[in-house]
């Protein structure tokens, strides 16, 4: 995942998401992963990491989560959700994914903490949804009995 060929320019990532470069600059300020380049060379956006960041951001907005989440946590929440749907999950693939995030300066501990925090967050959120759903079903049953 550290392959520089996976990195694209601001214009290319804007075209991929069908937005303008101003939006990409705003997203970058919000934490979208961006790799700084050496002097005189352009940096870039990793297509996969950027996609996971956008998916995580969208998911957290959709569930109206207003707490602070880092860019790494946004990536991890999307990664965890996608893993639930992926029947080809392997520990080796996840280790490579996690190692690939180190290119931004994250330590293995940072990545592990973000993964664990978001796994706990998702478990808690799903439990809260299940409890709420059960409560609503009980309310409907009680209302019908009245």
Model-predicted regions and their roles:
Residues 30-63:
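Short helix-start
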Residues 26, 39-40, 113:
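Proline- and acidic/polar-enriched loop/turn elements at helix boundaries
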Residues 1-29:
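Polyanion-binding surface elements
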Residues 10, 18-20, 45-46, 114-119:
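Intrinsically disordered, low-complexity regions enriched in Ser/Pro/Gly/Gln/His and often acidic
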Residues 1-6, 58-146:
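Basic Lys/Arg-rich amphipathic helical interaction modules
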